[in-house]
Amino acid sequence: CEYSSALISFNISPLTELYCIFVEFIQAIILKIYTYKIMNNVIVSPHYLSTSIGSKVFEMGGNAIDAAIATNLIQGIVAPETCGIGGDLFALIWIPGEKEPHYLDSAGFAGSGVNADDLKNFNTIPLNHPMSVTVPGAIAGWHELSQKFGKIDINDILNLGIELCHNGFEISEELHQSLTHHLDELSGQPSGYPFYRNDQALDVGYKIRRVQLGRTLELLANNGLMSFYSGEIGKAISESVDNVLTLNDLESFTSTWRKPLYSNIY
């Protein structure tokens, strides 16, 4: 969850990268909030690297939208227990001088391989089942926000994430706790391998590099954000969930601008 002067976005991943447990997501926000002010702009996020690296976007000539995308990107790298590129995105944007805010809905839908009869067999959302995965809307949301309101090239933002993935960062207390709590679910999954050693979560302060995620971001920088939903990445996503999400499901997804609900309370 990232806040800026112009954007609020929630990016929650049900399965891809790491599971986001909503209670822990809220706890992370309550426990630590990192604020950075540069000129007339303020960035607030749950992780100091998300805030500090996001602030660089202003120095690069970007606006609040660019900075919010960057903050969201970095948060998914350093705190995958809160969000990531496998999640969705909702944005509420108020442009100075305009009468009402813009609302972007970039939440993905269930795959065409899911039907109501199949879901009746579950009492709760099955976190370890492909049918719990919906089309990831976050990347499409970044694309739409950047195209409509962004000021700098999206690749300049992606490069900040690529650099961090390859240079590495230290495991935070919050990430360590989440990894420990979900050891049984995550340690045996490919996306979880880098975070564990000898069946134990990496210690606080351990420096980790997210090389595979960096390569994914490089593909997006080379081929465009929407290539996430097609080609090499799209096929890999579909295959990883046993084609419950088809390539057509991914390629047909688009973000939607909607009229926001509001009420006068004073």
Region roles according to the model:
Residues 1-16, 20:
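Low-acidity, Ser/Thr- and Arg-rich intrinsically disordered low-complexity segments
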Residues 15, 28-29, 102:
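Generic low-complexity segments that are intrinsically disordered, proline-rich and/or Lys/Arg-biased
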Residues 2-5, 26, 187-188, 220-221:
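Alpha-helical protein-protein interaction elements
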Residues 26-38:
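Short, Lys/Arg-enriched N-terminal segments with co-localized hydrophobic residues
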Residues 36-59, 64-230, 234-266:
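Noncatalytic scaffold domains of N-terminal-nucleophile
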